[in-house]
Amino acid sequence: MIKLTPAMKQYYDAKKQHSDALIFFRMGDFYESFGEDAKIIAKELEITLTTRGKDIEGEKMPLAGIPYHALDNYLPRLIKKGYKVAICEQLEDPKKAKGIIKRGVVRVVTPGTAIDTSMFTDPSNNYLMSISGGDGDYGVSFLDVSTGEFLTTQFADKSPYDRIASEAARMRPSECIISRTMFSDERLVERLKELNVLVQGFKDEAFDVDSSRKLLERHFNVSTLEGMGCAGLPYATSSAGAALDYALTTQMRELGHVSELSTYSDSEFMMLDSITLRNLEIVKNVRGEGNDTSILKVLDDTNTPMGGRLLQKWLLKPLINVDSIDHRLDALECLANDTMLRFDVRSHLSFVKDIERLIGRVVYGNSNARDLIALKRSLGSVPQIVESMGDDPGCEMLINIRDGLLGFEQLENIVKLIDDAIVDEPPVSVREGGMIRSGYNEKLDELKGMSTGGKTWIASFQQKERDRTGIKSLKVGYNRVFGYYIEITKSNIAQIPDDYIRKQTMRNAERFYTPELKEWEDVILSADEKITALENELFTEITSRIASHASDLQRIAVLIGQLDCTASLAEVAVNNNFVRPNITSDCKILIREGRHPVVEKTVRGGFVPNDTEMDCVDEQFLLITGPNMAGKSTYMRQVSLIVIMAQAGSFVPASHASIGIVDRVFTRVGAFDDLASGQSTFMVEMVELANILNNATPKSLVLLDEIGRGTSTYDGYSIAKAVVEYIHNKGRVGVRSLFATHYHQLTNISSSLKRVKNYHIAVKEDGDDLVFLRKIVPGATDKSYGIHVARLAGVPHKVTQRAKEVLQDIEDESVISKESDSKRGRKKKSAQYTQLMLFDPEGSSAPVAEPDPVVEELKELDVNSMTPIEALNKLSELQKKAGKGGK
C-alpha cells in the first residue's frame, strides 16, 4: 500500500466523511478532484482528465481540476445534473501556515440547498422537500434555503402517493429527503422521480418527532411551536425538523434568514393534482422546448423576482374562500382603474432586485459588494413606491402594503450605510479589494495612501533607471511569485549598473532588483496585504449589521412581491381586456364570451368566444360533441382556466364571469403512454378516471375528453356511458362536468338524465369542404366529420375517397338492418341502440333481462365429451332454435 502525502490524506478524510458527494479540494488557485470523482467531473464538465502520483493501491491517480475563480461557472452544471458537491477549502493563509495547510469541508451543495445566484436560471423558488409519515398520516415540508421560506403541512391518507405527487407538482422542489427506512418504498420514490425530483435518503433519527421539535424550537428561539401552527401535528413537525437538519448539515452554519415556519392546510386552497397541472399547462409547457404556452407565461408581467414567485404560487394554489379572493381582486381593480398609479408603481418596481435572495446571501455569509449595491438600489426604491401610492391607495390590501413598507424605520440607515461604505462599481470578488469607499475608514485611507504613494514611486523609479542606464526598453514589473523586478532584454545586458542584483533569468531577458526597489516592495506589499485584510474585515462588519435586520428586510420583500404580483395582473388585465369575476359560494358557473387566455394570443383570424352556463341542479353535465379539431378540448380547458384564474385572484378573459367556488379541478384530457411504468394509453386513462370518480366532490369541476378512445368501440362506448351515468347520479348534488365525446349515440342519454345537456361545436359544410365555426351551441350532432378532418390533415385523396365509400356501405347496411328488424317486429337488444342504464339512478332498480334458452343450453354443453357427429347435430339443433326466436 502506497503512503499518502499529507494533502492526499486530507482529501481521503474529506471523501470518507462525504462519500455520497463529489469533493472539490482547494489546492492553491485550483479546486481539484481525484479518483472516481475526477472521472465524473471531467466527463460532466468536459474538462481534461489527467493523473498525478499514485492512489492507495499504487495505481495512477486520476485528476481533474478547475480554477478557483471559475467555481460559479462550473458548480451549477454539476448541481443541475443532480450531483452533490462538497467544497473543501484551505482554512488558513498559506503564507502563515506552519507545515501542511489546514483544510476542511465548509459546505455541501445539493440541488435543494443551493444558495448562490449562479445556480438559478429563473426567479422560481428552489425548494427542498421533506416527507415523513406513518399509520395513514403524512407530513410534508418545503424549505427554500435561498430565500428563507419554510412551509409545512400534514394530512391523513391511507394511499398517499397521489397526494404527495400533487404537492410536489405544485411546489416543484429540486430535491426531496425521506428517511432511509421510507426510501425502500419504491412506489413513492418513483412517483417523485417522474416529476424530476432528486430523492435522497437521510438519517432516520432526523425524522424523530421529539428531536425535530427541539431542533425547531432551538432554531427559532421559542419554547413552543404553537405560534407556528404545527404543535399538534407530529408529522408536519418531523418533516420540518428533518428539512432544517439537512439544510444545517449541508451548509455547516446557522441559517438566520430562515426566521419563520408557516403551517398551511389543503382546505385553504383549490386542489390541482399533477395530472391537471400537466394537462392545463398552468406553469409549464408540456409540449417540449419552444414557445412557452403556459398560463403563467401569459399572466407574468412582473418586474421583480419576488412578484414572479408569488404569481406562480397563486396560480398553483388558488383560494377557495370568497372573502380572501375578493381581497385580491379589490387591489387588482384599484390598480387596473388607476392608470397613473399602476404606471408609477411598476416604474419604481422595475429597479428592485431579488431582495429575498440578496438577504439570504448576506446572512449566509457569501455575498459580495455587488450584492450590497443591488440591495441598496432596491431598498432605495421603497420610499418612491410608497410615495406613488399616496395617502389612500383605495383598497385594504394596498393600504396594508403601503403601511408595512412605511413601518421599517431602519430602511434609510441601511441604505446610507451601504452608500457610505461601498463604491458604486465594486469588483465581483471580495478577494480583489477596492470595494470600500474612500472616507469610510481612516486607517484604510492611510494604507491606500501608502500603496498609492509606493506605486507612484515605482513609476518614477522606472523613468529614473531608464535615464541612468540609457536603456529605453527597461521596465519595472510585478508578479505574485517574484515580487517587483527590473527587466532588461538580453541585448542590453552589458549596460546594467553594478548595483543591480540578479533575480530571475528568462529566455529573452534578465530580471534584477536593487536594495531601494526591495525596500519599497516591502512597503507596497505590506500596505496592499493590510488593505485586503482590512477591507474584508470591514465588509464582514457591514454585512453583519445588515443581517441583524434580516427579518424586517424579508417582510419588505414579501410586501413588494404582493404589490408587484397584483400590479402585473392588473397590467395584463387591462392589456388583454379581462374582466373582474364575481365570486360566489354557490355552484353556478356563468361565463359570457369566454376566451382561452393562451390560444387567443396565437390563433389566426381572431379567437371565437363562447358562453358557459352550468350548475349542480339543472345544467350539471355538459355533453359536448363535434368533429376533431373543432375546438372541444380548447373550450373545456378554457372554462377550467377561467375558474382557476378567478380563484387565484386574477381578472379573466370574458365579458362577464360569475364563478361558484370550485374545490378541485380534475382533468382527463390527452393521452400520454406511461411507457416507463409499463402502462398503456388505455391503462393511464382508466387510472386517471378512477381517481376522478373516487375523489370528486359536489364542489369539484371535472373535464373528461374522449373517454374510452383507448379501447374498442363497444368497450369505449360502454365505459363512456357508464361514467356519464355515475357522475350524474353521484349524490343529490351533481358534480359540475364537461364531457367531450365522439360517441354520438351517447347524446340520447339526455332524455333519461335530466341534468345532462347536449352541446356541439358548430361547423359549416361547403361541398367537400368543412369550415370550423368554433362556436358551441345547444343540441347534439350526429356526425364526426372524421373523413373531412383526414382530408384537412393531408391524407391522400384516394384514401379519403375510399373511406367515404366504406362509410356509405356501413350506413346503408345499418339502415337495411333497422328496416329488417322493424318488419320482423323484433325488439332491439343491442347496447348500441338501447338506452340501458349501466349505473342505476338512486332509488330505482334496473329490470332483470330474461335469460335466452339457446344461450343457456349452449353454456351447459360439455363439448369435450361429444363426438364430432354429436357436436354437428347439436349445433344444427341450436341453429334451428335460434332461427325461431329461441323459443
Swiss-Prot record:
Keywords: ATP-binding, DNA damage, DNA repair, DNA-binding, Nucleotide-binding
Family: Belongs to the DNA mismatch repair MutS family.
Family annotation (InterPro entries): DNA_mismatch_repair_MutS (IPR005748), DNA_mismatch_repair_MutS-lik_N (IPR007695), DNA_mismatch_repair_MutS/MSH (IPR017261), DNA_mismatch_repair_MutS_C (IPR000432), DNA_mismatch_repair_MutS_clamp (IPR007861), DNA_mismatch_repair_MutS_core (IPR007696), DNA_mismatch_repair_MutS_N (IPR016151), DNA_mismatch_repair_MutS_sf (IPR036187)
Lineage: Archaea, Methanobacteriati, Methanobacteriota, Stenosarchaea group, Methanomicrobia
Name of the gene: mutS
One example of a Gene Ontology biological process annotation: mismatch repair
Molecular-function annotations in GO: ATP binding; ATP-dependent DNA damage sensor activity; damaged DNA binding; mismatched DNA binding
Protein name from the UniProt record: DNA mismatch repair protein MutS
Role played: This protein is involved in the repair of mismatches in DNA. It is possible that it carries out the mismatch recognition step. This protein has a weak ATPase activity.
Organism, as annotated: Methanococcoides burtonii (strain DSM 6242 / NBRC 107633 / OCM 468 / ACE-M)
Source taxon at top rank: Archaea
Residues that bind ATP: 626-633
